[in-house]
Amino acid sequence: MAGTIEVLIPGGEANPGPPLGPELGPTPVDVQDVVQTINDETDAFDGMEVPVTVEYEDTGDFSISVGVPPTAELIKDEAGFESGSGEPQENFVANMSVDQVQKIAEQKSSDLLSYDTFNAAKEVVGTCTSLGVTIDGNNPREFKSRMEDGEYDDILK
């Protein structure tokens, strides 16, 4: 490959402007073709920030690989809110169910450092802590402690 460009793009909303356009401008690829291909491949992630890698050749040929959105984006989408809390330990912006945590853990399993769903769920809960999202009405730190005590083993293992 002649080069690689990595960017975060809102799903289905790539355009020739920043951050993609300035990166693609000096390359031999047709910018509109790249934008259209990215939009087609990321349409399912409507509005979520999605990592996209564009690899291109000197001939103008290109290939695109789409990653899984960041955990925070999946949580925002699943719980239905726009941005996290400015004071995540005091002001909570949303609540998620254990099933939603499990769903995100399974979606992200290939990108996380965890070897199983239980530990992947702990990573998701950690992100919930940073965003100010409760789980089944519990503070995420309290929920994580209950996970470690085995309360959710039947669901998350």
From Swiss-Prot:
Top-level taxon: Archaea
Keyword RNA-binding in annotation: yes
Basic and acidic residues bias spans: 139-157
InterPro entries recorded: Ribosomal_uL11, Ribosomal_uL11_C, Ribosomal_uL11_C_sf, Ribosomal_uL11_CS, Ribosomal_uL11_N, Ribosomal_uL11_N_sf
TM helices/strands, residue ranges: none
UniProt region (Disordered), positions on chain: 1-28, 138-157
SMART domains (alphabetical): RL11 (SM00649)
Gene3D superfamilies hit by this protein: Ribosomal protein L11, C-terminal domain, Ribosomal protein L11/L12, N-terminal domain
One Pfam family it belongs to: Ribosomal_L11_N
UniProt GO cellular component terms: large ribosomal subunit
GO terms, molecular function: large ribosomal subunit rRNA binding; structural constituent of ribosome
Keywords: Ribonucleoprotein, Ribosomal protein, RNA-binding, rRNA-binding
GO biological process: translation
Subunit structure: Part of the ribosomal stalk of the 50S ribosomal subunit. Interacts with L10 and the large rRNA to form the base of the stalk. L10 forms an elongated spine to which L12 dimers bind in a sequential fashion forming a multimeric L10(L12)X complex.
Family: Belongs to the universal ribosomal protein uL11 family.
NCBIfam families the UniProt entry points to: PRK01143.1
Record function comment: Forms part of the ribosomal stalk which helps the ribosome interact with GTP-bound translation factors.
Protein name stated in the entry: Large ribosomal subunit protein uL11
Organism (species): Haloquadratum walsbyi (strain DSM 16790 / HBSQ001)
Organism ancestry: Archaea, Methanobacteriati, Methanobacteriota, Stenosarchaea group, Halobacteria
